């Protein structure tokens, strides 16, 4: 029977994960034995956790335990294990700063439990593009790469303020900003409310676009919420736009729930990925199927 441990803190997760690593990095032990059949996850309501539930069923990992807490707890646990070269399996996704900080690898997913590659979309409330075509033009033209986003994520993870790092990025990448703002006019105090999910990637993108909008004369409000409330805010019109829609897999349920109540005005990033992730020093596991051995 698949087991879940929900809503624990950083200290508790560290204790659980380190206890799970009873075999340490014994290459003769199976991956299941090395991690005591435990996967370290993130927030229980997130899309990647739902997909991980599906993957565990698809691959008959019914006697495994999926631990859920915050993404901060997950990365703290990863750091603790990585520094000690302990085996660990986590739920992971790119873009994320941990792939720049650590040598990690995705486990192959031959059954496609996590679906095909994701994209990050920009969505708006209904009517926004007609009411604010200038801002909508900027948002629809916003596109960047994982490496570019990574410039911001890694600095924020190191303790710098998102707004400060975003301003530095905008000042450094003037040609790119010129592409995003092509045909966009300056305004005087027009208001815009951007809702975003508190993921490192969305903190980066929302702060950058927030800075660009401010430089164009907009009065910008950034509202941090969970994924569900973000979609609700767009659907009900309490927020104007969000750069945080991960489709077609992560936010599939929300997109279906609010179909017809929002507009998708562009894709800011392609090639986004999620799945089960391990350190590269775990040589004996390369596929989710290996976890059954």
Swiss-Prot record:
A Pfam family reported for this protein in Swiss-Prot or TrEMBL: OpuAC
GO biological process: amino acid transport
Broad class of where this protein is predominantly found: membrane
Signal peptide: 1-20
Record's subcellular location: Cell membrane; Membrane raft
InterPro entries per record: ABC_Gly_betaine_transp_sub-bd (IPR007210)
N-palmitoyl cysteine-type lipidated residues: 21
Membrane topology: Lipid-anchor
Lipidation (S-diacylglycerol cysteine): 21
UniProt keyword terms in alphabetical order: Amino-acid transport, Cell membrane, Lipoprotein, Membrane, Palmitate, Signal, Transport
GO CC terms: ATP-binding cassette (ABC) transporter complex; membrane raft
Keyword Membrane: yes
Listed GO MF terms: transmembrane transporter activity
SUPFAM superfamilies per record: Periplasmic binding protein-like II (SSF53850)
Subunit record text: The complex is composed of two ATP-binding proteins (OpuAA), two transmembrane proteins (OpuAB) and a solute-binding protein (OpuAC). Interacts with FloT.
Main function: Involved in a multicomponent binding-protein-dependent transport system for glycine betaine.
The protein's name in its UniProt record: Glycine betaine-binding protein OpuAC
């Amino acid at each position: 029977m698949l087991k879940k441990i929900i809503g624990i803190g950083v200290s508790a997760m560290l204790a659980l994960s380190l206890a799970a690593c009873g075999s340490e990095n014994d290459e003769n032990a199976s991956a299941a034995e090395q991690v005591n059949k435990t996967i370290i996850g993130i927030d229980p309501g997130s899309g990647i956790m739902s997909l991980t539930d599906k993957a565990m069923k698809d691959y008959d990992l019914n006697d495994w335990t999926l631990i859920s807490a915050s993404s901060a707890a997950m990365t703290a646990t990863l750091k603790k294990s990585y520094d000690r070269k302990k085996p660990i399996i986590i739920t992971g996704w790119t873009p994320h700063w941990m792939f720049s900080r650590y040598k990690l690898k995705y486990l192959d997913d031959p059954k496609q439990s996590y679906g095909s590659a994701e994209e990050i979309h920009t969505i708006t409330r209904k009517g926004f593009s007609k009411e604010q075509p200038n801002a909508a033009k900027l948002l629809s033209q916003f596109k960047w790469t994982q490496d570019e986003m990574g410039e911001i994520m890694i600095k924020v993870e190191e303790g710098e303020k998102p707004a400060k790092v975003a301003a530095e990025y905008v000042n450094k990448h003037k040609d790119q900003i010129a592409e995003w703002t092509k045909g966009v006019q300056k305004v005087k105090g027009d208001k815009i409310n951007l809702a975003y999910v508190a993921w490192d990637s969305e903190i980066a993108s929302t702060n950058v676009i927030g800075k660009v909008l401010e430089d164009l004369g907009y009065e910008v409000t950034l509202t941090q919420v969970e994924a569900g409330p973000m979609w609700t805010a767009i659907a009900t019109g309490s927020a104007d736009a969000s750069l945080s829609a991960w489709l077609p897999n992560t936010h599939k349920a929300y997109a279906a729930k609010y179909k017809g109540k929002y507009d998708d005005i562009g894709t800011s990033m392609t090639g986004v990925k999620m799945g089960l992730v391990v350190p590269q020093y775990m040589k004996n596991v390369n596929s989710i199927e290996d976890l059954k051995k």
